[in-house]
Amino acid sequence: MAGLFFSHSFLPVWGPFGIGKHAAVIGPIKGKTFLEVGFGSGHSINYLVQKGARKVYGVDISKTKLDFAAELNKVPITKGKVELFEKPMEKRLKLEPIDTVFSIYGFGWTIDPKKTLANIYSYLKPGGQFIWSWDNSVFSVIHEEAGKLVVSGSYHEEREFIAKKWKGVPVYLKYRKTATWFRLLRDAGFMVDDYMEPAPIMKKDLTATYYTIRKAERIPCSAIWICIKPK
């Protein structure tokens, strides 16, 4: 299914409906080092290189996505400015201390958030930041049906499930409340510096019942977390 996500939601955008004024949350780029968790087609990596990043690493579990990203970033890879890893985010990488780890709708797929957060924490310099976006937890339990917003599950009921609407391919997901994400980040040692729930700027439906603009205009679609590794 990697082709479904080719060039979707990459820097400076953080979610499916666009982010607007929140595009600059990545902070200074020139001369900095970055790691993208779940690099997809590699467009965010290319964006950072073009903006003067010293080095950009990327990790993704998909060989197809790695091929996409490697082709797009062929020149900076040969110059040693980009290095890609085909591994699960739960596996520890050997990396120099880096300035910023980020993930655009990638980190939320982890099957072991404690292990993944421990990895991310270890990669960062003291004072480094982890910035990531994911579906807002409230958005996840509401769908649109016949023009009305319908609560399709309990916000309080955290659950694992297999989604079967991805062209017939079963996909594992786990729904977590915002409070749970906060505790996971805190317990990993991070300080949550900011939390954003931006309004949409792209005014069109992306799916028939889930990513609809009427829903996104009333309920925040994306959540963006800015987390700091204390000095």
Residues of each region from the PLM?
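Conserved alpha-helix/loop element of class I SAM-dependent methyltransferases that forms part
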Residues: A2-K30
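Class I SAM-dependent methyltransferase SAM/SAH-binding core
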Residues: L35, S41-K91
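A short acidic, Gly/Pro-enriched loop at the edge of an enzyme's catalytic core
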Residues: L93-V101
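A short SAM/SAH-binding and catalytic strip from SAM-dependent methyltransferases
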Residues: T100-P113
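A short glycine-rich, Lys/Arg-flanked "PGG" loop and its adjoining helix->strand segment in the class I
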Residues: K114-P126
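Conserved class I S-adenosyl-L-methionine
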Residues: I131-E160
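Short alpha-helix
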Residues: Y172-Y195
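C-terminal lobe and adjacent flexible extensions of AdoMet/dcAdoMet transferase-like proteins
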Residues: A188-K231
